[in-house]
């Protein structure tokens, strides 16, 4: 095995190339690889944080949904109670109005009956006077006997 100058020169070039690569090329490559590794790690951490945030958000949404559902249910129950109360109040008011109308109608009927009785008394008194007039064949003075007619009305 001959060791000649070419091999030494190639070895020298190889070591110079190795030193140059280690000194000037390798550090930016390792730096780029480390930065890329760090970006990947940051991305994975952000993804994990995003997953955790998503889980928390879903939990909050579930709580908000449950709260809204219970609140809606409570509002529906309250609205139903209020509607029932309003219906009951309207029913009471309608009953009171009906009672008032019936009482007014009864009062009007009683007044009409009273008026009819008064008119009937007047008619009966007039007929009695005419009958007495015809029986006696003379005219009876109505003014003179007004008190007698009023007593007759009171008795009827």
Curated annotation (Swiss-Prot):
Transmembrane segments: 7-27
GO CC, one annotated term: proton-transporting ATP synthase complex
Keywords recorded for this protein, A-Z: ATP synthesis, Cell inner membrane, Cell membrane, CF(0), Hydrogen ion transport, Ion transport, Membrane, Transmembrane, Transmembrane helix, Transport
Gene3D superfamilies the record matches: F1F0 ATP synthase subunit B, membrane domain (1.20.5.620)
CDD domains: ATP-synt_Fo_b
Primary site of residence: membrane
Quaternary context: F-type ATPases have 2 components, F(1) - the catalytic core - and F(0) - the membrane proton channel. F(1) has five subunits: alpha(3), beta(3), gamma(1), delta(1), epsilon(1). F(0) has three main subunits: a(1), b(2) and c(10-14). The alpha and beta chains form an alternating ring which encloses part of the gamma chain. F(1) is attached to F(0) by a central stalk formed by the gamma and epsilon chains, while a peripheral stalk is formed by the delta and b chains.
Job of this protein: F(1)F(0) ATP synthase produces ATP from ADP in the presence of a proton or sodium gradient. F-type ATPases consist of two structural domains, F(1) containing the extramembraneous catalytic core and F(0) containing the membrane proton channel, linked together by a central stalk and a peripheral stalk. During catalysis, ATP synthesis in the catalytic domain of F(1) is coupled via a rotary mechanism of the central stalk subunits to proton translocation.
Protein name: ATP synthase subunit b
Gene name of this polypeptide: atpF
């Amino acid at each position: 095995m001959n060791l000649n100058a070419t091999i030494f020169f190639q070895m020298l070039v190889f070591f110079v190339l190795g030193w140059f690569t280690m000194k000037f090329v390798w550090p930016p490559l390792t730096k780029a690889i480390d930065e890329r590794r760090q970006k990947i790690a940051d991305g994975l951490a952000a993804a994990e944080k995003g997953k955790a945030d998503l889980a928390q958000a879903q939990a909050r949404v579930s709580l908000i949904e449950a709260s809204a559902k219970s609140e809606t249910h409570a509002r529906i129950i309250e609205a139903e109670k209020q509607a029932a109360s309003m219906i009951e109040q309207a029913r009471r008011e309608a009953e009171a109005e009906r009672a008032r109308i019936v009482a007014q109608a009864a009062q009007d009927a009683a007044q009409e009956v009273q008026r009819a009785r008064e008119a009937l008394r007047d008619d009966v008194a007039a007929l009695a006077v005419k009958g007495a007039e015809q029986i006696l064949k003379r005219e009876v003075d109505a003014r003179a006997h007004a008190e007698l007619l009023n007593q007759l009305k009171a008795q009827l």
